[in-house]
Each structure stands twice: as structure tokens, then as C-alpha cells.
Amino acid sequence: MDKLVIQGGVPLHGEISVSGAKNAALPILCAGLLTDGPLTLDNVPQLQDIATMRKLLLHMGVKIAELGAHCLRLDASDVHTCEAPYDMVKTMRASILVLGPLLARFGHARVSLPGGCAIGSRPVDLHIKGLQAMGAEIHIDHGYIEAKAAKLKGARVFMDIVTVTGTENLMMAATLADGLTILENAAKEPEVVDLAECLVKMGAKIEGAGTDVITVTGVASLHAASHDVVCDRIEAGTYMVATAMTGGEVRLSNARADLLDAVIDKLRESGAEVECSDNSIIVRSKGVVEHPGTLKSVSIRTAPHPAFPTDMQAQFMALNTVADTVATVTETIFENRFMHVQEMQRLGANIEVEGNTAIVRGREFLEGATVMATDLRASASLVLAALVARGETVIERIYHLDRGYERLEEKLRQLGARIQRIK
């Protein structure tokens, strides 16, 4: 199993390009099931989760042509099965996103209950309730969601918890439903907006994406389209925090600052300089490698977009471990999302957990050790901690990283980090 070996203590300098967003690409790949016309997608990241979704779509009969390293053309004109088997979805929670499109276009679906990171229950009942409100008959049998509907009907759906994948699934299903669907308490994440923009290019009638009320007027069919996947705000944020911690100056191209307001505010609060332009972000920082004690502690509280993103919580915890005073990190989205704490403590971090809040007391330095990645963002936070730790850090089980970061070690090496993957 691959490991990362990192020699800490090097400020970062240079420029890297931010990849397309995994969390936008996955639902957009599923949107290809809604039409028999080709869907051409550019800026698709090369990640394990994307490869898993491609395998699932191929299993269903979708033809996928590679037009370039990050460009795919999907053709779902000859789908021959509407089943997503357990073996293909057990590692990826986003597989539930085929449910809405299959049901809307083909009238039936059999989808295994999904897997993914072990960070909380992440229930799919909101997806099911929403589809039932639109007229679907659904039951769960031997770990599979069995759904059928002769024709989905527009409905008013209130989601009592903000759910990104739930919003996406119901929005896709509603594009081919009869009449008007109103999704209330909808997720406002940029990835939801990107999916809506792609669907509109395919002929869907959607208004309100990016607000908490999305209206979808169903159409008879969708058609061929082309779409560029939005940049990955979490990848960008991760490299921004890395630069703030190590010190140096890094320019991120293909990055949108307007998607990162909460993260940028907190980075500036920590003492980093952040300069934003149309398609790039520059981060400058003294950092703790050459200037210990210059990083200011920042307290954060996660909440749905546009508030502070849960997917940046672990990275800011890493920052706070080497900051000047005490910070609190409060997680309100997922339970079990402090699994990185124990591993950070192996590097010398001073962290106490009380319920859904971690109290982080900054210290002058961390020390290298062997640690284990537990989920996608936790593994990223361990990389950040290792970049400023004294000596060598070995991070095991980095397959979690490969699910969500494209060529992370190559990009960090490009910025001067001493990092290598070993088999």
C-alpha cells in the first residue's frame, strides 16, 4: 500500500493549477444518464472516485470516450441496466447520485446503499422522501434501494437538513418530471450551482441554484451539451493553508476566490496575505518554518455554504497546531469528523476534544512520526502538519488522498516541498 514520506521545514514557492472539483464532476457525470445525446465534459480531475464512477456508468452501458487527459464524452443512448451493484459503490457515497437520473429517464432503479468516508451516518432518507413526494415507489431490500415510477411528478419538497447530494439528486430527477418542482432548504454549494449550469445547457429549466429555494420546471427530454467542471475550491483552500503554514509565496491558477470567502477571511485572520484576481489567487506568508510564532490562531465553526466549509476543518486544525495561542474548531455538519486528532497528537499537537468542539493549543513546532490517514480531508491535514514538522513524517493509507486530490505530491514538489510516494 502506498505511503507518503515528507521531510518538513521547507517554505513553499511557485505556481500550480487547481484541478476540477471532484464534488462537481461526480454529479455531472451522473447527469449524463438524463439524455441520449452526448455530454462532453472538460476539466474533469483524474481521481479514484472519478474512476469508480466511470466504472459504474460503463457497467450500465454508458459509452465514455477520453478526448484528453481531463476531457470526457459520455453517451448514454444505450443504457442496458439501471442497477448500481454493491461491489461498485461500496467505496463511494456519491454513487447514490445515479438514483434520480435513472428513475427520471427510465422509470426504475436499483441502487446499493453507498459507502465512502467513514465520517458519520450521512443518511440517504432525504433523497428517498423527496423522490417519494414526486410519486416514486421506493423500498429498501437487502441493502438496495428499489425505486420505480411510471413518470415523476413535480412537487414541493422541503429538506429538513441541508443536503448537497440530496439537492443534486432531486434537482436532476425534477428536470424530466411532469410540472414544477420546488426544492426548499436546498444546498447552496458552488458544486450544486455548477451542476445546475450543466443541466441548463442540456435544456433543463432551473432557477434559484445557489439560493435555498430551487425551482425546476420539467421538460420532455434533455439534449447534448458541453460543460467545463468548476475548479476545486477545497483543493485550492488546502494549498492556501499549506502556504500560510510553511511560509513563502504561491500562486494558484484556475482558482476562484469568490467560492472561498470564508476560507480567505480566516487565512487573513491568521496573518497570511491573500491577493485575488479573476482566475487566480496568490498567498504570501512568513510561516512557521522560518518565523515561529508568527501564525495567529483562528477559531472556526463549520456550517453549510456560504459559511465555513466542513471540508476545510481538518486543514485549519493543522494550522492551529502551530499557531500562537488557543483556538476552537467546532464541527456542526458531520459527526466522527475529528478522527485526525489522534494522528496529529502523534506529531506532538496539543488538541482536546469536547463533544463537537476541538480545543487546539498552538505550539512552536511539531515532530515527524508515522501516522495513518483515516479519511480524505484528515489525510490532507496530516500532509500539512508534516510540511512544518521537524524531521520525517510517514503517512500511511494514502488511498484516501487519491480519492480527492489529483497528483498532490507532484504539485507540492513543484512548490519545493520534500515529499515522495513510496510503494
UniProtKB/Swiss-Prot annotation:
Highest taxon of source: Bacteria
Binding residue positions for phosphoenolpyruvate: K22, N23
Enzyme class: transferase
Family label: Belongs to the EPSP synthase family. MurA subfamily.
Entry function: Cell wall formation. Adds enolpyruvyl to UDP-N-acetylglucosamine.
PANTHER family in UniProt: UDP-N-ACETYLGLUCOSAMINE 1-CARBOXYVINYLTRANSFERASE
Protein name listed in UniProt: UDP-N-acetylglucosamine 1-carboxyvinyltransferase
Organism encoding this protein: Methylobacillus flagellatus (strain ATCC 51484 / DSM 6875 / VKM B-1610 / KT)
